[in-house]
């Protein structure tokens, strides 16, 4: 009985949380889709570790240690990723893509603005960004080019903060 009561309380809390986020004119079906989509975004956070220097050494492709083989991402040997990252799908696509991540932060900012902004800043850290300033595209080819959706998502998150009465100049 105590277990059922606790579960009932958590369900009521979740219902209240998502009700606050749902537009008042949304139908019951639209509200459920929104709730499930946002819950899916929260569920898709994953610990991600990829040490390119080590990976390139294992494939005899590290230009720093004299590797001779050609390999994808050979120019990203500086990269060591080890963080909790929002993934497109933890099962089918368990790696990040900066393009997807930028769009994830737009939805995530509705439920966890700090995590959303941290994700945007993460891609600009020295253990992610290339020395030439390029944001990594995705694991299979970090050097692919993406349109400036990262800048768009950053501005969007800043404007969302401002609309809630907060102005984080340091974030922008």
Segments from the language model and where they lie:
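Contiguous transmembrane helix-bundle modules in multi-pass membrane proteins
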Residues: 10, 15-22
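Substrate-binding groove/exosite segments of carbohydrate-active enzymes
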Residues: 22-170
């Amino acid at each position: 009985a105590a277990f059922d009561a606790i579960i009932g309380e958590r369900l009521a809390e979740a219902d209240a949380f998502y009700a606050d986020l749902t537009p008042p004119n949304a139908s019951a079906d639209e509200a459920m889709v929104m709730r499930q989509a946002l819950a899916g975004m929260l569920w898709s956070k994953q610990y991600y570790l990829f040490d390119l220097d080590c990976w390139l050494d294992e494939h005899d492709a590290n230009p720093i240690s004299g590797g001779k083989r050609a390999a994808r991402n050979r120019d990203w040997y500086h990269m060591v990723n080890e963080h909790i990252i929002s993934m497109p799908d933890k099962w089918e696509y368990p790696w990040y893509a900066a393009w997807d991540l930028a769009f994830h932060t737009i939805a995530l900012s509705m439920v966890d603005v700090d995590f959303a902004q941290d994700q945007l800043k993460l891609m600009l850290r020295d253990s992610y960004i290339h020395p030439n300033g390029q944001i990594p595209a995705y694991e299979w080819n970090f050097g692919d080019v993406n349109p400036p959706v990262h800048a768009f998502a950053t501005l969007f998150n800043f404007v969302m903060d401002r609309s809630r009465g907060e102005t984080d100049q340091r974030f922008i």
